[in-house]
Amino acid sequence: MARKNKKFSAKISTPRAKNSGYSEGGASRDNKSLKGYNPRKLGYKADIGANLSTLRDRSADLAINTPVGTAAINTSTTHTVGAGLNVFPKPKFQILGISAEEARAWARKVRAEFDLWAESKDCDIYRKNNLYDMQSIAYQGYLTDGDSFAVFRRKPTTPDMPYTLRLQLIEGNRVSNPLTSSTYVTGDPTGVEALNPDNGNRILNGVEIDTDGAIVAYWVSNQVPGEPITSMLTTWARVEAYGKRTSIPNVLQISNDTRPEQYRGVPYLAPVIETLKQVYRYTNAELTSAIIKSYFALFFTEAVTNSGSLNDMLADNGVDDPTEPVVDVSEYNLGPGTLNALPKGVDVKSVDASNAQSTFEVFSTQLIKQVGAALNQPYEVLMKNFNSSYSASRAAMLQAWEEYKLRRKWFARDFCQPIYEVWLMEAVANGRIEAPGFFDDPLIRKAWCNADWFGPTMSILDPVKDMNGSTLRVQNGVSTREREAAEMTGTDLEENIAQLAFEK
């Protein structure tokens, strides 16, 4: 009986417990297509910090040497920054206790003073670019390297420049862990983390943080580490992130973080590096193939008969070497109306110059569309290809414009606005601008510093439709004439009104 029960129980299969949810989907380990797919998501140091150098180098190469990579960087720069973002001071007159007219008069004076500094090359420590040129340089560096830096410097005033503030732009690869002393090394094999022996702070990819993880300093080298063409030794300087007495930033880091505890930015082209490189290789291969196929080549061949070829008979009689060419090509010419008599048994054949790779455009277009989708730049805008209908082209431009506006917000917040605030502090301190209560209350200071930043406008496909839309936005109170003038034409409304009155 026991044996029978044992056999009966053996026949009963115990149901295998199955997890629910993603266990049978994206997290399945039994699905054949996912068995070998086991990536790991780690922290900032392993996922980003350890790969930054490689990502920067490859991104820089694609931005310089591949047409699509160059287009992605330049198109974003052109539409986000363009010739430069202009400041429109907007003091919050309700908080400041002044009238709207007084606020407008103050804004006009501040803008004129700011342009005195910003439009001069004296604002650059190297005296090479004005602020608006530096915006483009900083933004391109941020896209290529993942982040870029600006250091506030000071120089004495001159009769033509009443401000001491100067800016020094620094490429992202110059901010790195110091390698001048073994005391900075922590044993990290990736080189991501180092240690400041003076205070025990950790240094992650050149960014020094305290025990709370707050940024306290940046380590900046005097040249790119590993620079082959140089007469200097590479040294590092510790630049405190904020002033000790004023808490004013000493360094601006322009980056777009996507993860908590991320201290360095990821290059803009990082998600599409492999695809861009493959498109470049495929394009080069097709170009080489097309060039080769464009050549018109002729081959002289000999006819083979039952008694052998012409060379066989000549070789048997000891007349000629069978390895010699069939004919002397210098005796024949190609040209219109030209007749050439060939020896018996000799024929002429040409190489087929047709291009059999008819799928190149379709395949490459699909790959570039994927690149554009990953970068939030529609294919039509990225490749400047507006062959679709008006509605489709406008939809592509509007979608791209949302991306550019978002990046402009980031850039203005990280770069332009902090520079404006530091400049305004000096302007108020030296008496060139009056702002009562500026240094007494942070809320009052913030109200004086409030400003909008406008840059290049969206391309207009149908001016009539866009103007009608602008008019309706103003009439319904969802926008202002000043904003519409700035966003549609990049001009100042008050200057337009004054010029129109003069022209009448």
Give the residues covered by each predicted segment.
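Extended, Lys/Arg-enriched charged tracts that mediate electrostatic binding to polyanionic substrates
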Residues: 131, 136-230
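Extended, helix-rich architectural segments
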Residues: 1-145, 152-165
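Short, surface-exposed, low-complexity cationic segments
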Residues: 222-244
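Extended, charged amphipathic alpha-helical segments
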Residues: 244-396
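Short coil/turn segments at secondary-structure boundaries
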Residues: 129-130, 152-155, 290-298, 382-386, ...
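Acidic/polar, glycine-anchored loop/turn motif associated with catalytic or activation segments
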Residues: 213, 371, 484
